Amino acid sequence: MQLVFAEGLCFDTLYIGGGTPSIYKSGEIAQIITSAFQGFDFLPNPETTIEVNPGTAAIEQLEGYRQVGINRINIGVQSFHQKNLDFLGRIHTAKEAQRVIEDAYRVGFENVGLDLIYGLPGQSQKEWRRDLAAATGYRPAHLACYLLTYEKGTPLQKSLTQGQFQALAEDRVRVLFDTTIRYLEDHGYAQYEISNFARIEKAGTRADGATNASRHNLKYWTFAPYIGLGPSAHSYIDPRRSWNVSSVDRYIEAAESGRLPVAAEETLSREQQMIEAIYLGLRMSRGIDLTAFKKKFRIDFTDAFKELISDLKKSNYIAVSKGHCALARQARAFLDRISSMFVISDFKSGS
């Protein structure tokens, strides 16, 4: 941490994850938190999150995490069905997932988030609704529902290419996506980002679920600066993005010799930043902040994409109101396709 230069930056979130930080005892986590707070400037009462794998977290650990300052816990449940966990290769069982959630509440955590995965081969709407029902039954403050993807080089991707199973058809994936939104909205959750839902505290107020939205994740979607520490961690300080070496040994060697363990970095061009701003903005339910876009890029978004926006509005795919341009609910399943339309369009004002 002493090698990282962050002058002028003040943070309000600390996120311990990914990987499996719950393999560490609370004393070790406390050292990380203390070092972070000593090495960087933080606002009062920062959101301090730890990711927990149900297969590595005993109740004593959870109690210890709470005592050392963790105020938000994110549990990688993935599924409440054992066959799904087996398919995904998870080390925890469905019963362990249930136990860790109950333990988190038992030791006093109020801000609990659960991660689920859908779109598994052969998954039915009924089966997915059972997972959603199990999750909402615990009334977590936050739910992240991720579509299963087959990353290159992973065991799942290799099994898929070898024909051991078939990926779920696109039309069935869309049904599950729509089911997610409808079910969670009916049970008191607001979709504030394409995969993220926050519990609404009071009916008729904070309808966007802002109270329980992940403050940390919002940084990624709004071009806020962030610093990543550890192997493979990414950092972004406008307009530069960097990422650390993936090897633990190389990371330690660099740090011990007084060198930043950075594998590479890039300076984003104005056009690259615009493309990311459009894609990330459309991921959020509130959409692209038109005032912020104009301030950052010195062009009017609605003028630059006037014809495309007009066509999308006629198809009820997009809406422009209250200073934002957002995807309509029925268009959120087509995020990638619609985002690409903006990317290939010619800016009237030039890029």
Model-inferred region functions:
Residues 324-329:
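Minor-groove-contacting beta-hairpin "wing" of winged helix-turn-helix DNA-binding domains
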Residues 245-247, 321, 344-346:
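Short, charged/polar low-complexity linear motifs in solvent-exposed/disordered segments
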Residues 332-351:
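Short, amphipathic alpha-helical interaction segments positioned at domain boundaries
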Residues 313-323:
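A short, conserved structural fragment
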Residues 299-311:
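Short amphipathic alpha-helical interaction segments
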Residues 1-299, 350:
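C-terminal scaffold of the Radical SAM
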